[in-house]
From Swiss-Prot:
<protein>
    <recommendedName>
        <fullName>Amphiregulin</fullName>
    </recommendedName>
</protein>
<keyword id="KW-0202">Cytokine</keyword>
<dbReference type="GO" id="GO:0008284">
    <property type="term" value="P:positive regulation of cell population proliferation"/>
</dbReference>
<feature type="transmembrane region" description="Helical">
    <location>
        <begin position="199"/>
        <end position="221"/>
    </location>
</feature>
<dbReference type="GO" id="GO:0010838">
    <property type="term" value="P:positive regulation of keratinocyte proliferation"/>
</dbReference>
<comment type="similarity">
    <text>Belongs to the amphiregulin family.</text>
</comment>
<feature type="propeptide">
    <location>
        <begin position="20"/>
        <end position="100"/>
    </location>
</feature>
<dbReference type="GO" id="GO:0005125">
    <property type="term" value="F:cytokine activity"/>
</dbReference>
<feature type="region of interest" description="Disordered">
    <location>
        <begin position="108"/>
        <end position="143"/>
    </location>
</feature>
<dbReference type="GO" id="GO:0042542">
    <property type="term" value="P:response to hydrogen peroxide"/>
</dbReference>
<dbReference type="GO" id="GO:0005789">
    <property type="term" value="C:endoplasmic reticulum membrane"/>
</dbReference>
<feature type="compositionally biased region" description="Low complexity">
    <location>
        <begin position="54"/>
        <end position="77"/>
    </location>
</feature>
<dbReference type="GO" id="GO:0005615">
    <property type="term" value="C:extracellular space"/>
</dbReference>
<dbReference type="GO" id="GO:0007267">
    <property type="term" value="P:cell-cell signaling"/>
</dbReference>
<dbReference type="InterPro" id="IPR000742">
    <property type="entry name" value="EGF-like_dom"/>
</dbReference>
<dbReference type="GO" id="GO:0005154">
    <property type="term" value="F:epidermal growth factor receptor binding"/>
</dbReference>
<keyword id="KW-0472">Membrane</keyword>
């Protein structure tokens, strides 16, 4: 068999030079195109998907979903990394998270300054009076409620507080009685006054009856006299008539 004929050396060299030139030109074009479209290669959408460059889309490749956002231990960008460092530097305060964007923390009282602590220490501390068992408190005189709560309790009297009974009473004025001295007593007549009044009433009744009887007697007497006078006048007229009649008969 005959060996295949090899191309001449100048042709091979020219092909190699042309291929290297095309390769170098293709690399320069890819670098410039990738520099212009750099935001698309590294952008992430709001839902956590990575968007490929236009060169990849033009070549027919589809948008490939990327897995969930990287964990806090591996930040995806410089901004996220800065926030994570800030959260790490903050003091850990116990709290609870209501939402992804809201964090509720407990209120912590700020520490006192040295000046405030010195001012508080300069103030004299009040000494507690009385022993531990409170004997002196028991021996203290209790406040009189008549001076505060029951100041206007008694209407017509004076308020009195009885300590051993722990009760409030009223010392009423004359002619007043009751719990609050609000009732007034009326004066009652003695037996002598009542008997005198009875005697006076009897005398008045007797006098009135006597007056009435005398008036009746006087009236009856006057009526009788009038009747008698009238009767006597009629009798005299009858006598005169009889006398006249007798004289007439005698003449006839």
């Amino acid at each position: 068999m005959r060996a295949p004929l090899l191309p001449p050396a100048p042709v091979v060299l020219s092909l190699l030079i042309l291929g290297s030139g095309h390769y170098a030109a293709g690399l320069d074009l890819n670098d410039t195109y990738s520099g212009k479209r750099e935001p698309f290669s590294g952008d992430h959408s709001a839902d956590g998907f990575e968007v490929t460059s236009r060169s990849e889309m033009s070549s027919g490749s589809e948008i490939s979903p990327v897995s969930e956002m990287p964990s806090s231990s591996e930040p995806s960008s410089g901004a996220d990394y800065d926030y994570s460092e800030e959260y790490d530097n903050e003091p850990q305060i116990p709290g609870y998270i209501v939402d992804d964007s809201v964090r509720v923390e407990q209120v912590v009282k700020p520490p006192q300054n040295k000046t405030e602590s010195e001012n508080t220490s300069d103030k004299p501390k009040r000494k507690k009076k009385g022993g531990k068992n409170g004997k002196n408190r028991r021996n203290r005189k209790k406040k009189n409620p008549c001076n505060a709560e029951f100041q206007n309790f008694c209407i017509h009297g004076e308020c009195k507080y009885i300590e051993h009974l722990e009760a409030v009473t009223c010392k009423c004025q004359q002619e007043y009685f009751g719990e609050r001295c609000g009732e007034k007593s009326m004066k009652t007549h003695s037996m002598i006054d009542s008997s005198l009044s009875k005697i006076a009433l009897a005398a008045i009744a007797a006098f009135m009856s006597a007056v009435i009887l005398t008036a009746v007697a006087v009236i009856t007497v006057q009526l009788r006299r009038q009747y008698v006078r009238k009767y006597e006048g009629e009798a005299e007229e009858r006598k005169k008539l009889r006398q006249e009649n007798g004289n007439v008969h005698a003449i006839a």
